[in-house]
Amino acid sequence: MKVLALRHSVAQVYADTQVYTHDNSKDEYENAFLISNLTTHNILYLNYSVKTLQILNKSGIAAIEIQKMDELFTLIRCNFTYDYIDDVVYLHDYSYYTNNEIRTDQHWVTKTNIEDYLLPGWKLTYVGYNGSDTRGHYNFSFRCQNAATDDDAIIEYIYSDELDFQSFILKKIKERMTTSLPIARLSNRVFRDKLFKTLSVNHDKVVNVGPRNESMFTFLDYPSIKQFSNGPYLVKDTIKLKQERWLGKRLSQFDIGQYKNMLNVLTTLYQYYDMYHEKPIVYMIGSAPSYWIYDVKQYSDLKFETWDPLDTPYSNLHHKELFYINDVQKLKDNSILYIDIRTDRGNMDWKEWRKVVERQTADNLYIAYKYLSTGRAKICCVKMTAMDLELPISAKLLHHPTTEIRSEFYLMMDIWDSKNIKRFIPKGVLYSYINNIITENVFIQQPFKLKTLKNEYVIALYALSNDLNNREDVIKLINNQKKALITVRINNTFKDEPKVGFKNIYDWTFLPTDFETSESIITSYDGCLGIFGLSISLASKPTGNNHLFILSGTDKYFKLDQFANHMSISRRSHQIRFSESATSYSGYIFRDLSNNNFNLIGTNVENSVSGHVYNALIYYRYNYSFDLKRWIYLHSTGKASIEGGRYYEHAPIELIYACRSAREFAKLQDDLTVLRYSNEIENYINKVYSITYADDPNYFIGVKFKNIPYKYNVKVPHLTFGVLNISEQMLPDAIAILKKFKNELFGMDITTSYTYMLSDEVYVANISGVLSTYFKIYNAFYKEQITFGQSRMFIPHVTLSFSNEKTVRIDTTKLYIDSIYLRKIKGDTVFDMTG
């Protein structure tokens, strides 16, 4: 959903668009809630309130002021992520395909021969970091740039088994045009940039679990962030390999040698960050022209010093010459060294060429050892070839993708590795490594142990659901880690599957009720965005690959109506009941009937079940940005910080009724997951609320009427407005509550319209118009620890006779209250009041 705020209406009609005019009779929060539950994708918001826009954005729903028609046209035709703090719109707009172009935000790609393999007549365009170079295309009142690129497809091609790039990119473009936009992946980069910038300012120690290559630029400016990954491939791990021969295999039609060099350097850099927590000088020997340095400098101020007879245009200091062994002494401490020396083969015979390569490999290794032999804080990554070698057992082997798999791999060592025990590695074993293993990640740090960290802020995005992790240990970590943002895969199966397959792995599934967190927000991706100053135009869809975002230690926890709130809670219900269901009242009718309340007159205005909780349960797959457990808990403790004006507080029994209705719904739908979720939420309600029932009552509240439009043979027909189980010492407190609600009680608009048999020989008249006040009084009694109400649903009625009678239907008739009293059952009246 996107909300585009206009001062004046527009004549043009847009598909999937609805107009909402600000309702001045309601406060900003109520307007925001109504907007959020509209069912179209585009909302044109007229006579808007800036405060309402702020509320929507904090809820993760993109809401933007529109000043010009160009802005409206651009935003209505595509999806986007909105930085509502800095007023920046990041479009995810692929309409540039109509210019016969694909786009990249990695400069090195533009220096390859990739355009030789594009679709006929197509070109490649560089658009800068997150599309920053496209800002000039949009002369808007807010900053706007198009962050959409095809880098995901290019990188996927590099790691795939496909060789024909034109066929591959054609397939990917067609997929993009025919399937739902993977909005979370597109906006994730914007989110990660914002997230780590915020956390690094607010927390001294930040730990990040499970980063992948898509984050390789994100962390360049954060050397102090501790990374945990899957660990490196060590020289000693080759003991498991059998010997093989040269294979020779082309991975890419266009030259990706620069990409390989960049990955090698970044892998070395992040290893340095892991060990020393600061930025090094980056020395590079060979590997010209290294256009990828330009990409790195878009994200960081790293300094590069390079040696190569060819130009390296983006180096801070380039020596256009060969590097000799005596030059090693020029290299300073606190540095990394990348050695990528290889003479061109030219017309050399392959046997002669092989001798040259082996000699250069030995020379490269000698430079590496020389560099590491003195000083401190150094790591080296050196080009190697498959040959009989003695290598340190703790050194790391790297084999990032390159244009062709031949004899080349890379060795990474720190000072300690260079002095460690060496092992003889046969050429055939190294060929086996080269032929079978691709390094898929620049982050090769040690795996994370599922234990709480006392002083660190832990971030684990899409990293812990894998069934290689012990599920109970994941839950324990989330429950106990005081400061964290952790995601786990939500269980949106219908058979309550404990794990689901994804690609070639299995993930554990989770529901919010699996966790017993303290002061944590459990929300969706878009709910999490709102907390970090972002909003999004397309909410998460229930694809099966959805995640709960669990934020612990956030100062937003008590701000119940500002973040991870109830916005959009009825949207799915509206979509269904206004298009597919038997009636738009279907939800109200079902909730009453499933709790044995058969008086459906006025059910849409006087419903005895919490619609919030009911919708949050049965449609949790569609809107889990609303943190239901937090909402229940903060109301139960009275600690909710409510900024909005009108805010209805439910009685705990209304929440219980909602769980029962949701359970009935789940049984009819054969939805085992909602069935469990409903049961567990009901158990949670009973845990945080101390609900007691007056199933053996000794007092009741009676309402006597001036007029009863039916025949009756009881002495005094009355409405039993709830029963109590209290001691005589509690009578003054109960009476005080009745006095407090006197005006509201006598102001109830009470009506009746028919009679019926409540049970055998109990003939009653229906009563409407009292439930809202009943639940308010229930809450007042609950807060004073006075037992009020029974475990079964309160069905308002007036007993007319203790005999079997025929049903009578009359025109709806208003009843006027004569008196309201508190009486002991089979005893005397202890309190009486009149209007």
Swiss-Prot record:
Residues 556-692 are annotated as: GTase/RTPase activity. CDD domains: capping_2-OMTase_Rotavirus (cd20757). It catalyses: a 5'-end diphospho-ribonucleoside in mRNA + GTP + H(+) = a 5'-end (5'-triphosphoguanosine)-ribonucleoside in mRNA + diphosphate; a 5'-end (5'-triphosphoguanosine)-ribonucleoside in mRNA + S-adenosyl-L-methionine = a 5'-end (N(7)-methyl 5'-triphosphoguanosine)-ribonucleoside in mRNA + S-adenosyl-L-homocysteine; 5'-triphosphoadenylyl-(2'->5')-adenylyl-(2'->5')-adenosine + 2 H2O = 2 AMP + ATP + 2 H(+). One of its GO terms (molecular function) is GTP binding. Keywords: GTP-binding, Host-virus interaction, Hydrolase, Inhibition of host innate immune response by virus, Methyltransferase, mRNA capping, mRNA processing, Multifunctional enzyme, Nucleotide-binding, Nucleotidyltransferase, RNA-binding, S-adenosyl-L-methionine, Transferase, Viral immunoevasion, Virion. Its EC number is 3.1.4.-, 2.7.7.50, 2.1.1.56. It comes from the Viruses. One of its GO terms (biological process) is symbiont-mediated suppression of host innate immune response. InterPro entries: VP3_Rotav (IPR011181). Multifunctional enzyme involved in mRNA capping. Catalyzes the formation of the 5' cap structure on the viral plus-strand transcripts. Specifically binds to GTP and displays guanylyltransferase and methyltransferase activities. Has affinity for ssRNA but not for dsRNA. Capping activity is non-specific and caps RNAs that initiate with either a G or an A residue. Together with VP1 polymerase, forms a VP1-VP3 complex positioned near the channels situated at each of the five-fold vertices of the core. This is Protein VP3.
